[in-house]
Regions:
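Anionic, Ser/Thr-rich low-complexity intrinsically disordered regions
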Residues: 2-123, 128-145
């Protein structure tokens, strides 16, 4: 049996639908937020990655959105609550960093929730400026040069 692998997730595929459900459960539902049609339509131009603990069990996801030819924004990083604290998020981020570098990007930017900021600092992301409010909670703009 195949265990613990990361793969690209094609937009509008069954795996993408599963990724959306996981992102909603971890990131949106606790804040009472829904996805808009416009937000989901924009995702067709983004790059999605999934961490599967088995061939049919998605436990972590993240999305990368090109800002320009040099910068890509990491978004919607989510790991199922029952699978957190096992290195899945770190593996996803490292995979995305390798992907970004191979794709020719020179820098990754992200908006980290207050609670996630130490996680990104451990992965050598740096804070830019002061904290700000996004979707009703404190965030930090962060970046990493590849």
């Amino acid at each position: 049996m195949i265990h613990n692998f990361i793969v690209p997730v094609e937009f509008a595929s069954p795996a993408y639908d599963e990724a959306l459900r996981l992102r909603y459960k971890v990131l949106r539902e606790p804040l009472g937020l829904e996805y808009t049609v416009e937000q989901l339509e924009e995702e067709s131009e983004q790059f999605h990655f999934g961490f599967f603990s088995t061939i049919d069990h998605l436990t972590g996801v993240l999305t990368m959105q090109a800002v320009n030819t040099d910068i890509v924004k990491m978004r919607q990083v989510a790991v199922d609550d029952s699978s957190q604290k096992h290195g899945i998020g770190s593996q996803l981020v490292e995979y995305a960093e390798t992907w970004a570098k191979l794709a020719g990007f020179k820098k990754i930017e992200l908006h980290a929730r207050d609670i996630a900021m130490p996680f990104y600092e451990r992965l050598n992301y740096k804070i830019i400026g002061e904290p700000f409010i996004e979707v009703g909670i404190k965030h930090y703009a962060m970046y990493k040069t590849l």
